[in-house]
Amino acid sequence: ENHAMKQQNFHLVTHALCPYVQRSIITLEEKSIVYTRTDIDLANKPTWFKQKSPMGRVPVLLVDENRTLFESAIICEYLDEVTPGSLHPTDRLEKAYHRAWIEFGSGILQSIASLYNAKDSASFHKIHAEIHSKFRIIEGEVSGTPFFTGEQFHLIDAVYGPIFRYFDVFDSFTDLNTFTNLPKCQWWRSALRQRKSVQQAVAENYPAHLVQFLKNRDSYTSQLILTEGM
């Protein structure tokens, strides 16, 4: 089986800022899988990408350049299944529980997109209050340290690493205090920030790149950034 693995060629098609891409890269790094990565411009998608990605989104995983997988959750599950060990708990109920909270994390990502696209202060703060209440719910579910359920890093941790990373950048131009009074979320965020795979999921210029992206949104967030002189 291991011999067969070495023959497989993994090529991940990505975008530099996409959080769904990050969870796929974290999975590849955690499982020590050799892969190549190609960043594309989503505003100017190459023709070959449109053929490979029926939904027009990243990430896309090309396996041996002939089979194409899309949607990050499916890519992560596949990579986990075809390599030794697992980033999921072995207990089936526990695994399903992790998957449910992964889905919850995807909902937080949608709220974050709504946050940075909000046109005015009122809608921005309303959406932020919703995000804060979602983290308050998560606070009651984090059952271990340093990761979601303890010492072992799981797929759910790969999902929340990119979520927390947004707030590292938001903190540079806002005082949202998203995690005030949420000590478990704070510890978890800190542990994920220090995890090598989470760090390697983005380029070193990610914060500056994200700020530039946000600045161009014509939103309340872009006003905040300009006010800070960034």
Predicted regions and their residues:
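GST-like domain detector, emphasizing the conserved glutathione-binding G-site
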Residues: N2-F148, R217-T221, I225-M230
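Alpha-helical scaffold segments in carbohydrate-active enzymes
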Residues: R23, A100, F104, I137, ...
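Conserved residues at the C-terminal ends of beta-strands
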Residues: D64, G161, E204
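Hydrophobic/aromatic-lined pockets within catalytic cores
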Residues: D80-P84, S106, S143, F164, ...
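Non-globular targeting/processing and membrane-anchoring segments
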Residues: S111, Y166, K196-A201, N205-M230
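Hydrophobic residues in alpha-helical segments
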Residues: Y116, V142, L192-R193, V202
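GST superfamily/GST-like fold recognition
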Residues: G150-T174, T178-W187, L192
